[in-house]
Amino acid sequence: MKAYWVSLYTKIENQENLKNYAQTVTPIIKKYGGIALVRGGKHITYEGEDFPRTVIWEFPSYEKAVECHESEEYKAGWNLAKKTTNRHMQIIEGQIMISKSSMQ
């Protein structure tokens, strides 16, 4: 079953650091089979905390998603942004429901 990294950014103090992080880790994430599904964009918050940026990556399996996040190369990339960026980040195993019949 596929898995997803869901990152909800609560604070971005330095856009350049975040850009460097993204440029560094994108090829690393892709090496583990990651595909970007959502990267920022216009949003409206109706309930709860506002997150100025949301990023969702899809992985071929939960194991690959965890392996990527725990890899030394990914951790080194995250070091580029973590001092000026706060986020909620989860790895979720599941599937995207793409039709009404699949949601029943």
Predicted region positions:
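C-terminal structural segments of small proteins and small subunits
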Residues: 75-90
